[in-house]
């Protein structure tokens, strides 16, 4: 229904209401019939469905397959169900952790929304009552005044200089002056753009000036905001870089496990020398059991726990992560497209300069000649520019409330965009004083005098030139400049028309104001530059203001361009793709421009983050690799589509989150390299032993190492602090595989190294037990191999504190890793030396000398890896890479 094309009286009748509103009974009936006035929350999956989603992870599927095979072995061969129980325990813990962390983020978002739960003043039974905005129904008459959030869509039916900011919907930050008259469609015009419907008010917008009333035409999902929310709910999310890499890793592990099965199965058949059913079944079971033991059971849980730790750390830094895997995506961010207002700046217009003889007199005049108000706690409400003037006066000891008592308003000529000024009349001890404020060029032209030593003296050309120079100097700094003048009346004039009041004025002064940058953002931008991250400013503000802020922050580099939305619209796709990397500032942009900008960067292969707060920002946030919503000023729709919500709306928080994302990805890589290197050593050891015809370790031994010896140090690696160079590296390309940067080589050589040490320990144990060097089964050899493998992998976890740095010169400590290592050593020792445990695991307790030798051999690996890292660092320096 196009209510903006209808007379207000007709709209009221069509909605079965009246200018005195609905009756309480009718409102309750409509509420019961149509539901609450709120946006439908995104349909939440049940706990069961959330758990099933966690189980759909490729790494988890491999573990479930391993558990199934182990279960078959247990049933058919009478084996223990220990393997099955342990693997399923790991799977359940991983799934529960994932669900818990993501629900925790949703609860944080809900808490933010509850903090901003709104109320509305409505007419019910002809009386003004305050109700929760979600209880509004179609036909309610809502009273609007400065500072109110518009709670639903409605037709304006009363207007007293009403101005509404609709930036959340239209992207246009300039408040829209509203009226009551109908809007007529021109020939061939099917609809009127939302921003031009000046007799309508929409959910998500804010009243910044004046008063008025509207009759509610649409609530909840039927509002314009609701329609956008519904469209966004249909869009699907893509995979994060980490999800893609873990999927690739799962495929590699799957083929590796299958390869192990085939090779060991073939070797067992050849050694058996026959193809009887019993031989084939036995060979198959041995191959499968060893392959199951070769899977890094703790990897999925480690990744989930590391991500969860990162999410917790980020929440402490005001970044609420809504998707667990999005944490890592932040680490490879290459471009951050940021709003200006509130994110780079303080979202608070502030007077930073003035011109005039008397600052106190100028502040008093400006504060009285505006409609912004201040409460007892110093909180100012009103149109941003006027709020800045009242706040400025307050800092000078001129409280607006006190000023109003001393100089009560007795008349006014409201602001008009045609006149570009407003005037107010106030009772004063010597009669009536008039204050007029507005555009400098207009005010100056109406001034015949200026204030000097508290007296009005005739305006001179020299002083007029001085005023104009000051005005230009402020404007050149991208300040918003207002002029103020006064006029003294002996008594209140009979005629308060502007033509009567606004002449023969006495100039008082100029104020220059700007939304100042957040003090911490400059350092954050510098940190982005050092980290190889490009910051792009996107704003609905004027281009001159945007450029001034961008230069101050260092966003606008030498040779970079600033373009307006209009200029962007004139560029075709080919031109824009050729130019976009040279553009650092976009001003006066529309919502569709933001999506176009994000798409251009993504198409060029850059991992892109996009911030936003309004409903109109939601599509661009959804289209970015990392959508960042605002927790304070952001709409619910924007928060719901974002991957991350900033609780403080601060750009510096994004940079902190990027650093945390890099740390998390580093730690995940460290854990993966540690676990895969350890598992490779197990696979090689078992493979060599199988080829040579002896048993070095049993599957249960490998499962113990994977889940006890390896898992806790791997988790501790996830708590490793960020390395000193983490924000001096270039962002890693999202397409880089999990084994990029030489990690594949490292896993291979470290796996070979540890397996060589384990085999050496086995033969030393065999020699100590038998006194001869032969290739046969040995109880002492198996125990020593187990001790060496455990010790080598525990020591290897310390190597992994830095993939290239020397662990002996690291300035930080990892207490969690130290305790995990000590616990793993103690558990390994108990399993081998306590008789009933040793018997359960098939070990023969060894002598103290054998124990020391086995552990000593295991420690050799750490020294050798550090020596190799020394050569790797030298190679990196030659290539000019950051260490």
Regions found by a protein language model. Give the residues of each.
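Transmembrane alpha-helix/helix-exit interface in multi-pass inner-membrane proteins
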Residues: 264, 755-763
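Generic alpha-helical transmembrane segments
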Residues: 709, 782-797
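A glycine- and small/hydrophobic-rich beta-loop-beta segment
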Residues: 777
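A C-terminal functional module that forms or caps the active site or interfaces directly
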Residues: 800
